[in-house]
Amino acid sequence: GLAAAAHLIERRMPVVVLEAGDTPAAAVAEWGHVRLFSDWSELVDAASARLLDATGWTPPPSGYPTGAQWIGRYLAPLADALGDRVRYGARVVGVSRSGRDRLVDAGRGDQPFTVHVRPTGGDDYRLAARAVIDASGTWETPNPAGADGLPALGERAAADRLSYRIPDFRDRS
């Protein structure tokens, strides 16, 4: 989402990034202890680097960062460079076409999008948009353990004993 925003800014197009978390890349922070399998050169977008250059940012050296390093050295500075275009605590709860529903479908593709937003501690609001990029990822909606994308037998009943997260086994002593 942040990199897409940098590309749109280069094209002088209006952009809003809606981040459900209270910080940049909040989902990545939850697995910040995990080392990525991509080198820095594959993780830094060219348009984002150009936007960051104006802030005095320097690209990280080559290597394989952890999620926390990716945030600290790149994603957080990029979010800062985007400024108030990034709205934190703004969970998207729906995207629809203006004036269209399951019964009224004619001309659907010609209508702007309506983005339904639920802010942390506030009242829901809506934004009109010509285009929407969903960069939310799958962190909050992990795949179930069963076949065919469905929960395994007994998975729902055992939900309070299951975790789909990446454990952190580092010694913190």
Question: Could you describe each region identified by the protein language model?
Answer:
Residues G67, S136-S173:
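Glycine-rich dinucleotide-binding loop and its adjacent helix/turn
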Residues T58-T141:
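Feature captures the FAD/FMN-dependent oxidoreductase FAD-binding
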Residues G21-R73:
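Glycine-rich active-site loop/strand segments that organize a redox cofactor
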Residues A4, A27, R97, N143-A145:
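Short glycine-/acidic-enriched loop or helix-start segments at secondary-structure transitions
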Residues G1-V16, Y164-S173:
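Rossmann-like dinucleotide/flavin-binding elements
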Residues P14, R85-R87, D160:
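Conserved beta-strand segments of alpha/beta enzyme cores
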Residues R11, G32-R35, D148-G154:
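Glycine-rich, phosphate-binding/catalytic loops in enzymes
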